[in-house]
């Protein structure tokens, strides 16, 4: 089963002026190997328009051709059969499967490479919207945001607010305001993920506390 070299068969005919011989040469071609992708069996990429070449090799092959799964083709992606070059369209996310088929003796032999295309992270959206207002005073307010396809969101506070004694918890968006702080505070949410990070701001107007009413004539008068 493992023989893959040259065999020579010699026929010898006995008789007058013999023997007479002739030979027959048999070339035993090795069995084609299973293709192996240079990128391995799987890979991950971010959603976006791009061309990626998926090369495979195989022992004793007379040539390798490549195909792409039907769902990927249906979404507008294409493949060059001779090279394994896949052209991804901008809107595609999901799984693409490239199949390499190696021609040769006892072939073809095939192998697949699966690509997970991760969607682009969305722009964060604050639960409170783009802006809000509050009255001056010491308290803590949490400003949360969500983003599609995000692997995590972190929060930061503008430099002026930090200098004014206010603080923020970067993992939660919880802002602790100093009692004396007035003016604008800007909370920035940064969403991690494919083709990210993506950011959005929430602006808080911190209004002055209204002062006590004072009569021009004082607290009391006589008439």
Task: Locate each region found by the language model.
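A short beta-strand segment in extracellular, disulfide-stabilized domains
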Residues: 49-58, 138-147, 223
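A short beta-strand micro-motif common to beta-rich folds, especially ectodomain repeats
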Residues: 5-14, 94-104, 183-193
């Amino acid at each position: 089963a493992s023989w893959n070299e040259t065999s020579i068969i010699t026929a010898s005919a006995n008789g007058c002026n013999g023997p007479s011989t002739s030979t027959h040469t048999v070339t035993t071609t090795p069995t084609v190997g299973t293709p192996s992708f240079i990128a391995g069996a799987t890979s991950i990429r971010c959603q976006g328009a791009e061309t990626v070449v998926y090369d495979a090799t195989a022992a004793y092959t007379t040539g390798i051709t490549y195909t792409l799964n039907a769902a990927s083709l249906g979404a507008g992606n294409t493949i060059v059969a001779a090279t394994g070059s896949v052209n991804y369209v901008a809107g595609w996310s999901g799984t693409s499967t490239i199949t390499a088929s190696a021609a040769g003796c006892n072939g073809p032999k095939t192998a697949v490479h699966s690509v997970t295309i991760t969607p682009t992270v969305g722009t964060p959206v604050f639960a409170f919207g783009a802006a809000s207002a509050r009255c001056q005073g010491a308290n803590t307010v949490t400003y949360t945001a969500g983003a599609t396809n995000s692997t995590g969101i972190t929060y930061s506070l503008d430099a002026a607010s930090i200098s004014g004694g206010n603080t923020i918890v970067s993992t939660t968006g919880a802002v602790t305001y100093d009692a004396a702080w007035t003016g604008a505070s800007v909370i920035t949410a940064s969403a991690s993920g494919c083709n990210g990070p993506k950011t959005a701001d929430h602006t808080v107007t911190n209004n002055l506390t209204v002062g006590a009413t004072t009569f021009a004539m004082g607290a009391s008068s006589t008439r």
